[in-house]
C-alpha cells in the first residue's frame, strides 16, 4: 500500500532529520509530502469523476502539473540515489531503498 509506505518513509526520514541538520533532507521530506498529497488528490479526482479523460479536458493545467510532478519525482530519485551511495548507516540505507522503490512505483502509477 503506497499510502502506508509514504507514511512510513516520512516518519523514518523525520527520525533521520533529528540526527542531522541537513537542509537537503528537509527539502526531500517536503517534496515527498507534496507528492503524496498530489497523488492522493489525483486518485480521488479520477475515482470521483470515474474518467481520467474528463479530468484532462476539464483542467488545462493538468498536463503542466503532471510534467512538473515528474520533474520532482526525477529530482527525488536522483537525490535518494545520491544519499544511498554516500551513507554507511543501515537505517538510512533501508529508508532510502524504500523511498526509491516507492518513488519508482508512484512514477509508474502516475504515468499509466
Curated annotation (Swiss-Prot):
Q: What is the designated name of this protein?
A: Nuclear export protein
Q: List, in alphabetical order, the GO biological process terms annotated in this UniProt record.
A: exit of virus from host cell nucleus through nuclear pore
Protein species of origin: Influenza A virus (strain A/Equine/Tennessee/5/1986 H3N8)
Which gene is transcribed and translated to give this protein? NS
Coiled-coil parts of chain: none
- Keyword annotations of the record: Host nucleus, Host-virus interaction, Transport, Virion
Where in or outside the cell?
Answer: Virion; Host nucleus
Q: What does this protein do?
A: Mediates the nuclear export of encapsidated genomic RNAs (ribonucleoproteins, RNPs). Acts as an adapter between viral RNPs complexes and the nuclear export machinery of the cell. Possesses no intrinsic RNA-binding activity, but includes a C-terminal M1-binding domain. This domain is believed to allow recognition of RNPs to which the M1 protein is bound.
Report the family membership.
Belongs to the influenza viruses NEP family.
- Subunit-structure text: Binds M1 protein. May interact with human nucleoporin RAB/HRB and exportin XPO1/CRM1.
State the source organism's domain of life: Viruses
Where does the protein principally reside?
A: virion
For this protein, the record's InterPro entries field holds:
Flu_NS2
Query: From the record, which residues define motif Nuclear export signal?
Result: 9-18, 82-91
Q: Which GO terms describe its cellular component?
A: host cell nucleus; virion component
